[in-house]
Amino acid sequence: MNKKYIFNRVLLLAGTIACMCFIIAPQKKIKVWMIGDSTMCYYGPERTPLTGWGMPFAVFFDSTVQVNNMARGGRSTRTFISEIRWQPISDSLQEGDYVLIQFGHNDEAKEEKYKDRYTTPEDYRNNLIRFIRETKNKKAFPVLITPVSRMRFDKEGKALETHTEYTAIMLEVARQQNVPVIDLDKESRDLYQKLGVEATKLLFMQLEPGEHPFYPQGSKDNTHFNELGARKMAQIILADIRSLKLELAQHVVVRNAK
């Protein structure tokens, strides 16, 4: 067996191994980190039909995207930071990741029973800026989302604003920091107005006593969504990701309703 033959065989084997390594190397996933409150977060089956909009949102991406829903009920920007929920996310961020940021419900809660979560407008602004800057420092992409509107109508059937001050702050921060923002507050309210009072109730945790075994006393919740409402909010977010021309939009897929 001559040396040239052996040399060619070695080259062929090396090339084959290189190709195999290239083929089996796992593709780096785009990670989407979701931080926010109870309107976004995950709920277990024992809470059905209560659904955060982050739950249906996560299924509308192809296999190259990994959605990490880190939202938690009752959290404001302040408590999300003070409870050391943000720092591990910030430390884990990699280039090309996304951070979807929706806070406001609990930040604005001044009632005595919610004083543990209240955040002053100035601190709210500074906390949003911190999320943005730390995300950008990792060459990841922050996306602000104004707090989804609660269901509230006046006696004439007009859908009312429920987050005026904190939504305005977030929109201003987005403009000043030059980051994309999805105005879910306005878009959800526009949806309620289009649907009207009675149809809007079908989006929320509105249950009569005895209607659902998990909620024997019923529920008159104007803040949290059922499966239908969560899906509607997720559809708004996905549509805006496309309209903002985020690279993430290329990985959105159509899922048929079950």
Model-predicted segments: where are they?
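Serine-esterase "nucleophile elbow" of acetyl-processing enzymes
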Residues: 23-72, 87-99
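Short, solvent-exposed mixed-charge patches
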Residues: 256-258
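Bacterial Sec-dependent signal peptides at the C-terminal "C-region" and cleavage site
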Residues: 7-10, 14, 18-29
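Alpha-helical cap/lid subdomain in secreted, periplasmic
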Residues: 3-5, 27, 85-231, 235-254
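A generic, residue-level signal for flexible/boundary positions that often mark functional hotspots
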Residues: 18, 34, 217-219
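Acidic/histidine-rich helix-loop elements
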Residues: 41-50, 71-80, 111-120
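Extended, non-catalytic scaffold segments that flank or surround catalytic motifs
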Residues: 15-18, 32, 154-155, 162
